């Protein structure tokens, strides 16, 4: 969805392209606030469902801007003109040319999105009630908060019990970041290329 939106906004023949881009940027500068967001999710019937964690993060305006900049800088207009002469339409050009040439930025967006969702617990905190739907990070937060309260309430500072609590805390944190450590090496080369998009000229 992000790449499709970025491709549409990169086309000069799109009517109202500047106004649409400004509308997208406006939502990034000024958010509606937490209460309207909560009411919207509730009225859409996504409260206490996993969709409340998935749908709000489907499109990120910053990612759209990054992808649009990448498309404008890596895919020249002459390439589309040559493809259109051969009878290639917008959607086919997107699938055959834009997607293959955008692999580095796609890898970066996937990594940013994965890290953002993996580290997020706030949406689950306000939208999810059932324990079987709660993500790992919410359990980790609840454990860390409860263990800190227990530490402060203990009058007798038992060194051994405090050491065990710290060990459990660190183990949970390590387990929570382990999937990202496993995932990152496979897309590291694309990540470096994507981050350097637009940084080197000449």
Label every model-predicted segment:
Residues 1-202:
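A hydrophobic, multi-pass inner-membrane permease signature
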């Amino acid at each position: 969805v992000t790449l499709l939106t970025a491709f549409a906004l990169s086309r000069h023949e799109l009517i109202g392209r500047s106004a649409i881009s400004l509308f997208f940027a406006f939502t990034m500068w000024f958010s509606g606030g937490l209460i309207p967001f909560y009411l919207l999710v509730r009225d859409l019937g996504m409260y206490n469902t996993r969709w409340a964690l998935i749908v709000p993060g489907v499109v990120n305006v910053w990612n759209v801007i990054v992808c649009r900049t990448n498309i404008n800088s890596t895919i020249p207009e002459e390439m589309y003109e040559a493809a259109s002469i051969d009878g290639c339409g917008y959607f086919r050009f997107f699938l055959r040319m834009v997607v293959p040439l955008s692999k580095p930025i796609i890898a970066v967006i996937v990594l940013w999105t994965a890290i953002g969702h993996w580290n997020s617990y706030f949406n689950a905190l306000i939208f999810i009630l059932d324990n079987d739907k709660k993500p790992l990070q919410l359990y980790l937060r609840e454990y860390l908060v409860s263990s800190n309260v227990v530490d402060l309430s203990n009058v007798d500072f038992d060194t051994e019990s405090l050491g065990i609590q710290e060990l459990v805390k660190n183990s949970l944190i390590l387990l929570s970041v382990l999937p990202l450590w496993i995932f990152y090496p496979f897309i590291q080369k694309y990540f470096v290329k994507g981050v350097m998009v637009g940084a080197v000229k000449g």
